[in-house]
Amino acid sequence: MTRNEKTEVVAKLESEFKTAEAIVVCDYRGLSVKKLEVLRNSAKEQNVKVQVIKNTLANIALKNSDKVGMELKDTNIYLWSEDQLAVTKVAAKFEESNSDLFKIKTAYIDGEVASVDKVKALSKMPSRDELIAMLLQVWNAPIQNFTIGLNALKEKKEQSA
């Protein structure tokens, strides 16, 4: 890779990292290409970007985008998105199914370096859409129970008449 190509890669990563709400760094050593494709496809469905990046280039891009403090060693694959929950869910779900080969190392969430435990905790939280669905279900429950009661009363009166 020439110096100009490296500069272009760093500039592209820098602009993407600046808009990213969360960046998760994982160890992928030993994963087959087929399994990496599964990861990329599931990430693409959630609008999460996945890329294997050299640590030196990633360090420069992270530093230039004011996301410092992550210790990057060995082979890493980077997942990032503007949606914190989507990134953590994709990484945690893939780690569950490939725990022997894929490990979450560190993350950058909410302007600070996050531990693996925080990433896993975030991955278990419901998404915005799921929260809205839960709220609507709570709002609809009293009305639904009321209509069920009215229907039961109506049927009871019809049977007695």
From Swiss-Prot:
GO CC terms in record: large ribosomal subunit
GO process annotations (BP): translation
Record GO terms (molecular function): large ribosomal subunit rRNA binding; structural constituent of ribosome
Keyword RNA-binding part of the UniProt annotation: yes
InterPro entries (alphabetical): Ribosomal_uL10, Ribosomal_uL10-like_sf, Ribosomal_uL10_bac, Ribosomal_uL10_bac_type, Ribosomal_uL10_CS_bac
Pfam families membership: Ribosomal_L10
Keywords (A to Z) from UniProt: Ribonucleoprotein, Ribosomal protein, RNA-binding, rRNA-binding
Signal sequence region: none
Assembly, per entry: Part of the ribosomal stalk of the 50S ribosomal subunit. The N-terminus interacts with L11 and the large rRNA to form the base of the stalk. The C-terminus forms an elongated spine to which L12 dimers bind in a sequential fashion forming a multimeric L10(L12)X complex.
Family, as annotated: Belongs to the universal ribosomal protein uL10 family.
NCBIfam families to which the protein is assigned, alphabetical: PRK00099.1-1
Its biological purpose: Forms part of the ribosomal stalk, playing a central role in the interaction of the ribosome with GTP-bound translation factors.
UniProt name for this protein: Large ribosomal subunit protein uL10
Gene symbol of the encoding locus: rplJ
